[in-house]
Design a protein with these regions (language model features):
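Active-site cofactor/substrate anionic-group-binding motifs, chiefly glycine-
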Residues: 49-102
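Alpha/propeptide regions of enzymes that mature by internal proteolysis
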Residues: 38, 91-92, 96-116, 128
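General beta-strand structural signal in soluble alpha/beta enzymes
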Residues: 83-85, 106, 112-117, 138-142, ...
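N-terminal glycine-rich anion-binding loops that anchor highly charged ligand groups
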Residues: 8-11, 26-51, 65-76
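Phosphate/diphosphate-binding glycine-rich loops and adjacent basic-rich segments that engage nucleotide
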Residues: 148-184
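Solvent-exposed alpha-helices and their adjacent loops that cap or buttress functional pockets
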Residues: 73-76, 105-107, 132, 155-159, ...
Length: 184
């Protein structure tokens, strides 16, 4: 039987923050990324938790993820926002946009946001759960480069298209569906 080592969640979060700081990210961005990774681990979504650290480190070293990224609003209306993430940490760009979308939805009743040049966002359930804390329904989805084969195929032809929806309810525990069209 395989034995697992249990690590205190606060120690794990602090370890992740220190790792992101060592890679050159600022404290706020290191905290946001670490919270999203920890959220996934605490819910058994280990594919989107701390095990991603070596991959993120390689992306930073290869220039695919930028510690000094400058997120910019490219276009917006009363209900929509388009941002360029400049290869920031995915959760940092998602958090930036999520806060804008929530405020616009409070102002006009609905809002939509789109991110260009983003990196791995982590578990989408995190973001829709945060939106439900404001009494709103949250929907998140993404497209990407082909990373899975079509039925009967031998090579990648489709994106796994992650999708999540969060619906608030009276019991403080929202209904959250977080899925993709592949197994991770």
């Amino acid at each position: 039987m395989k034995k697992f080592k249990v690590i205190d969640q606060y120690k794990l979060k602090n370890f992740m923050i220190e790792m992101f700081l060592a890679l050159g990210f600022n404290k706020k961005h290191a905290r946001i990324e670490s919270e999203v990774l920890l959220w996934a681990n605490l819910r058994g979504i280990d594919s989107h938790g701390v095990r991603r650290l070596p991959l993120y480190e390689s992306w930073v070293n290869e220039g695919e993820m930028r510690p000094n990224a400058k997120i910019k609003i490219l276009r917006e209306s009363a209900a929509t926002t388009l941002i360029d993430a400049d290869k920031a940490l995915g959760p940092v760009a998602m958090d930036f946009l999520m806060r804008i979308v929530i405020q616009k939805a409070k102002n006009v009743g609905v809002s939509w946001g789109v991110i260009r040049n983003n990196t791995h966002e982590g578990a989408f359930g995190y973001y829709v759960s945060e939106i439900t804390n404001h009494g709103m329904v949250g929907i998140a989805s993404a497209g990407g480069m082909p990373n899975m084969a079509m039925y009967g195929g031998a090579s990648a032809g489709l994106s796994n298209s992650p999708f999540a929806i969060g619906v608030p309810n009276e019991d403080d525990f929202p209904l959250v569906l977080d899925m993709a069209t592949s197994v991770v």
